[in-house]
Structures are given as C-alpha cells and as structure tokens.
Design a protein with these regions (language model features):
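Extracellular/oxidizing-compartment recognition motifs
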Residues: 1-224
C-alpha cells in the first residue's frame, strides 16, 4: 500500500480536517477487496500533531445499487435530505458525533507514493442541447441506464415531467461534476457520461466493460 503527502501552510490555531470515506466492498482495478480504514497523520516537521476525530455514517448514500462497471466501484445514489446539513463547512459542529476506533489491517508496510497527487482542474462545459423530458421506463432502481436513455425528449408526445441539459467537455476526461442549483425538495438530478453521443444522445454505458455498466450519478435534492 502507498500513501500520499500534502504540504500546506497554516496559521497558528485550530484547523478542521474533513474526510469523506467510501468503502467499495469489492475488488476493483484500483483497490483490493479489503476491510475499510482511514490512515491519516498530521505533522509539523518531525513532530506529529494530535487530531481529534469524530465520525458519522452518511445515511443518504444508498449502498451498492449498481456498479459503474466490473472494474470500478459503485454508482453514487444519494438522498441529500438525509445528510447533515452543512457538514462540509469548517464551522460545522460535530461534537455530537461518535469517536472512531483504531483498527489493525494486515496490509504490509506502507510506502510513499511514487507519483504526485492527481491534479484537479476546473473545466466549464459547453451547453450543446436542452429541452424537456418524460419518463417511459420502469422504476428508478430497475435499470437506471435504460431509464435514463429511454426517456422521451419530444415534448409533443407526453406531458413534460422534467428538463434536460447536454454538455460537451471538449475531450474525453476523468471528471466529477460540481453543480449549484436551486431546486424544490425531492427533485431528482441524474447525471450521465459518455465518450461519444449515440444517435445524438448520451448513452450511460461503458464499452468493453466485460459486464454491465452504469456511467452515471443520481441525487435527490434537499431543497434550496
């Protein structure tokens, strides 16, 4: 196993370190199937700095709904109404959360990563299409990819049940969406990705996956 090091310059005083940990529970091309853990050390020079940890399961995340594909982990299927509001803000009060326990994992000796941390760049996508949609296939969890791809985008056939937007990132990228929307409580937001358009539409499947695939996210809005 390898670890990464990040150096930051901080003023004197108290600072907040927040980590969102996701355990896949299956073997992927990135991780073996191992028991979950979090390994973090904070230090100033050679002196280790004590960290007071608190933890809470994020109940808004549905567990193991669908795998992205057999080589990767799971689709994010999240009801944001069930997440602690504002928990990612530095001022959030987590004093009521539980304290984690130390665990031992027989993983061998940790070594520093041989590559630098992956860079994260902001990319503004280009809007290439928009309109309204209507559902025509099954329930949300039956087959998320088919439900997404088979939605009717012709407003002349069915009453509109929602809106859609199609964006172009300019090239094939490893990306993660960052959206800020003012939505009513319970509104559903689905995001799908594809390397190319199929018949002018995003097809949320990954070619050559050697199995089923769902290249998408699903969120239920808290409201606001």
């Amino acid at each position: 196993p390898e670890y990464q090091t990040r150096r930051v310059r901080l003023a004197a005083g108290e600072h907040t370190l927040a980590v969102q940990v996701q355990h896949e529970g299956v073997a992927t091309r990135i991780l073996r199937e191992i028991q979950p853990f979090l390994y973090v050390r904070a230090s100033v020079g050679d002196r280790e700095v004590p960290v007071r940890w608190h933890c809470l399961p994020l109940e808004g995340y549905a567990s193991q709904v669908r795998r992205v594909n057999p080589q990767l982990g799971w689709v994010e299927w999240v009801d944001t109404r069930r997440l602690p509001e504002g928990w990612q803000q530095a001022s959030f009060d987590d004093s009521s959360w539980a304290e984690p326990v130390s665990v031992r994992r027989p993983l061998g000796e940790f070594a520093p990563s041989r590559i630098a941390p992956v860079r994260s760049l902001d990319v503004t996508p280009r809007l290439i299409g928009k309109g309204v949609l209507a559902e025509v296939f099954g329930y949300p969890g039956d087959n998320p990819g088919a439900s997404f791809f088979l939605r009717d985008l012709d407003d002349r056939r069915y009453p509109a049940q929602g809106v859609w937007r199609r964006y172009d990132l300019g090239r094939v990228r490893l990306s993660r969406p960052c959206l800020r929307m003012d939505l009513p409580e319970g509104a559903v937001v689905e995001i799908a990705f594809s390397e190319f358009l199929s018949g002018g539409r995003v097809a949320p499947w990954i070619t050559l996956s050697a199995g089923d695939s769902y290249n998408m996210y699903r969120f239920i809005a808290r409201g606001g």
